[in-house]
Amino acid sequence: MAGLDDLVTALALRAGEPTGHHARRWSSATAATRWSRPRPILRQHLPYEAAVFVHYSNLDPAMRRAVEDGFAQASVAVCVASSTLELGIDIGSIDDVALVGPPPTLTSFLQRIGRGGRRTGLTSVLCLPRSPLEQARFAALLALAQSPSPSLPIPLAPSPPPFRPSVLVQQTFSLLKQSPSGAVRLADLRRIAPAEVEDRALRQILDHLTALGFLRRGGLGEWRPAQRLHELADRHEIYSNIGADPLALQVVDAFSGRVLAQTGQMRSKGETFLLGGRLLEVVWRDRYRLGVQPAAGQPAEETLRFVTAPFAVPLDISQAVAGQMGLAPGQMALVHDETGALLFHFWGDLYGALLAAMLQAELDEEDSIIARLNEHCLRLPAGLLSLPPWDEALAHQQVRRLMPQIQPYLELGRFHSLLPPDLAYLAALAQVDLARFAQLYRAATVLIPPAGLRLRLLSLRG
């Protein structure tokens, strides 16, 4: 399927088409850090001169702005971006968008492709799937983009979604830095918190942040910033609840101290890695930072990996893929093979993981394992005619057991880890929406697909 080579070919072919009075400008949305050298390869193989930029959220804001300004000013340019393309980055007008692999949600898809064609009023997007699974998801996204109300066996998710209390952690930090007195009181949080958040929960948040060393008790009924909060503020990490873990390591220029990026990986002195297409070497490190300098004449040991939450394909996208296959809402397909059976549930990553856990708990044999193949499919040790009866207690038990695994799917906010554990769990549970899962479970039916559908389903095994 498609990849970086296909993107280069597409850029070369598209360059020959008329573009009016403007030079052609591309943005490629992809997991840029997964490629060891996206910028050098594009520069080497493009059959025309073009400025090539790399943009992702873990870059320091100053470096991101430099990339945005450079792309906006260049007459012919390619910007290889991660999901930052959907966040409204200021990179000027874009003629075309290429997607190497599909984004997880319809909103992400529309935001990414919507960045292109604003000068002409015509959206031009090149979808490059790397597997039959991605091809099916692209087809589902394109279908939903034309008719964004999918047929689901249950009502759509509630709107607005449940409140994420991690916002209150970020707001506490921000209030403290804006406070003329340098202190925050419970009443300050009460003014910005939703009515459903009780005063007791607000006090728990403040006390927990104190125990973690971000706050300290001041005068009667007030809290002041402590050392760990000062360190976060110095790194400008307190002003948004969106993005990477605020406690991640900083990658800085070894001599100027300029912040370059964030990562969750500690490195040893002398190690080399690629960052934004540049080869860098670690020359010193301390508790929170890695000091780096440019390194020449040697291969990179690997590309720097960043702290990013894994994306989850949601229920509506997975159900749209089922619709593309010809299944009705709520239908599952069971395909027998030599090792057991494949259950194509089309429930997405989150509910697929919970379904696997529920079915696993129903098995008596300890050596019978239910495996998740992807967002649409489970491998079962044997077939089944229908799902076991719904068990509310078992569902709660499995959610609690799975929570460390599924929590990154829930987009709980970058300060979620600083909430009191009980409050953090309840916030995550609200995002799971067990009542909705129960509706989906009870409405499910299992069918044995005919031969043609069976072959199409087997292409989605991954």
Model-based region annotation:
Residues 228-256, 301-310:
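Short, amphipathic alpha-helical interaction segments positioned at domain boundaries
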Residues 134-208, 254-279, 284-462:
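C-terminal effector modules of nucleic-acid-centric enzymes and ribosome-associated factors
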Residues 69, 75, 241-267:
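Short, compositionally biased strand/turn segments
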Residues 221-227, 290-291:
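Minor-groove-contacting beta-hairpin "wing" of winged helix-turn-helix DNA-binding domains
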Residues 1-179, 187-224:
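Helicase motor core with emphasis on the C-terminal RecA-like subdomain
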Residues 226-228, 348-349:
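Glycine-centered helix-coil hinge/cap
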